[in-house]
């Protein structure tokens, strides 16, 4: 008996492409072509086409495609991540995962050029900016950048534009390796002289445009950046601090310490590891630098009736207006992940985030007190330990289900995250040959100024409240869950639900980027 094709398979193309054969023919007739192949032949030069035929593989249905993805996911061994290096274990609250990350009302909305159809996202992004501003102690924050390394690179560009006479930039040797690499390359690309230095030594010479300081360092160590900030200011330069937003719940803000710019990643505010991205970076600056800052900036205005309304501000910085003289490109953003991070802060509030930070720090302190060879006295969540053979320790812990960082042949880094437990500390201590002991706080520069004081961070802490808030915001937006958007194409609008559903599977979402 001849069977009809699987309905799921036969309809996959039609479900996700849109036009059917008759609609396609209407468009071809209007353009004067007999077929889609004829249109492509006319539009695409022959010399740039792929030679030969594509592999002849059978099409998969949605169900079959997900089953195939499941086989790929099952091949990943997900170790519990204690690796660090700018990527931290975090817990995404289910209400945020389901109603932001996996919700087409949020992930198919277009770049918010038009405030009339973007009020929900603009409010959520303003929450992100408020969060970053309060944590960093600097008055102006943007609505996200692409990642921590490129944010540091953007900070170098900002310092160079603001201090045109300075042609030297100093990079802290304690920056994460990937941040150091990207930042140095960006500096060289704009003809700056790059010096990678141990900032515990005194700065030598003049002609600086700025310095980039790690706070904390890649080994977790926390040092007071004020002497370096003061020294660069005395030489007419600017100070950028690369920091950790969760650490800033417990250590003093860069702005309070005198920094001009602060950058970092908001990943550990509820955004999964995702094997390295996408994650929303942030930048905050002093008021004097706001017109040089890259990235979207959400501001509060009034509508035609005089009511408060949100819109993108200072757009004369943007490439679509200023062209080659622009200091920003509006597409250099991670809006969905910034919304996720902001909602994580709203959901937990200052008290909840402080508890999370204190617990993580406490576990790190207990671990540090239980092993020999700890390299630094002050730290937040990461402990660097000197050992005889770092790779042997890493392998032993991998066999036990843990991923830790071989900083060098004789140093292992252990970075605690939100899901870490006392039982994890016990197993880690055992692998290092230590014995359990209680630690004491070792922050180095404890925070004395309040943070997250805006009422939005103290009003929405139950799942019902958050669910309703997210719905209220998405109802103020226009996305593909309501209608077609007659604008550009740089969104995830073509991603089928069956594809988006898989990105939060633990076997994909919880893999650290430096996992073997």
Model-derived features: where do they sit?
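N-terminal entrance/gating region of PLP-dependent enzymes' catalytic architecture
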Residues: 19, 42-127, 321, 444-516
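A glycine-rich phosphate-binding loop feature that marks nucleotide/adenosyl-phosphate handling sites
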Residues: 85-91, 146-150, 173, 200-201, ...
């Amino acid at each position: 008996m001849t069977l009809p094709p699987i309905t799921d398979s036969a309809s996959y193309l039609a479900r996700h492409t849109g036009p059917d054969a008759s609609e396609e023919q209407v468009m071809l007739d209007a353009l004067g072509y007999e077929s889609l192949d004829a249109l492509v032949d006319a539009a695409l030069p022959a010399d740039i086409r792929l030679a030969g035929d594509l592999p002849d593989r059978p099409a998969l249905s949605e169900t079959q495609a997900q089953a195939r993805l499941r086989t790929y996911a099952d091949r990943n061994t997900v170790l519990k991540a204690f690796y660090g290096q700018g990527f931290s274990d975090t817990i995404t609250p289910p209400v945020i995962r389901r109603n932001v990350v996996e919700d087409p009302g949020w992930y198919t909305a277009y770049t918010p050029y038009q405030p009339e159809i973007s009020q929900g996202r603009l409010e959520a992004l303003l929450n992100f900016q408020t969060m970053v501003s309060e944590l960093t102690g600097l008055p102006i924050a943007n609505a996200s950048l692409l990642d921590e390394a490129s944010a540091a690179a953007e900070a170098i560009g900002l310092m160079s534009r603001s201090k045109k006479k300075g042609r030297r930039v100093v990079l802290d040797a304690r920056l994460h390796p990937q941040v150091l690499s990207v930042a140095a390359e960006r500096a060289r690309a704009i003809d700056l002289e790059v010096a990678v230095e141990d900032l515990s030594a005194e700065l030598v010479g003049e002609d600086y445009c700025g310095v980039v300081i790690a706070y904390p360092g890649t080994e977790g160590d926390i040092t007071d950046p004020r002497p370096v900030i003061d020294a660069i200011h005395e030489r007419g330069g600017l100070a950028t601090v690369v920091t950790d937003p969760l650490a800033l719940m417990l250590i003093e803000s860069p702005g309070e310490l005198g920094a001009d710019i602060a950058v970092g990643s908001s990943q550990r505010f509820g955004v999964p590891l995702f094997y390295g991205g996408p994650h929303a970076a942030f930048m905050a600056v002093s008021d004097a630098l706001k017109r040089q800052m890259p990235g979207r900036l959400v501001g509060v205005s009034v509508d035609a009736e005089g009511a408060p309304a949100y819109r993108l501000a200072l757009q004369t910085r943007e490439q679509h207006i200023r062209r080659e003289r622009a200091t920003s490109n509006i597409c250099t953003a991670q809006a969905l992940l910034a919304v996720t991070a902001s909602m994580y802060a709203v959901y937990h509030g200052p008290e909840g985030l402080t508890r999370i930070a204190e617990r993580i720090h406490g576990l790190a302190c207990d671990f540090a007190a239980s092993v020999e060879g700890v390299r630094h006295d002050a730290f937040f969540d990461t402990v660097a330990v000197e050992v005889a053979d770092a790779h042997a320790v890493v392998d032993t812990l991998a066999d036990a289900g843990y991923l830790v960082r071989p900083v060098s042949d004789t140093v292992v880094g252990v970075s605690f995250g939100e899901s870490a437990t006392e039982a994890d500390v016990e197993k880690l201590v055992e692998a290092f040959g230590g014995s359990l002991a209680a630690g004491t706080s070792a922050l180095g520069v404890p925070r004395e100024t309040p943070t997250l004081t805006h009422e939005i961070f103290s009003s929405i802490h139950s799942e019902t409240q958050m669910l309703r808030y997210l719905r209220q915001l998405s109802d103020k937006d226009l996305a593909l869950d309501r209608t077609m958007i007659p604008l550009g194409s740089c969104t995830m609008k073509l991603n089928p639900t069956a594809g988006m559903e898989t990105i939060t599977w633990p076997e994909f979402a919880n893999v650290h980027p430096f996992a073997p």
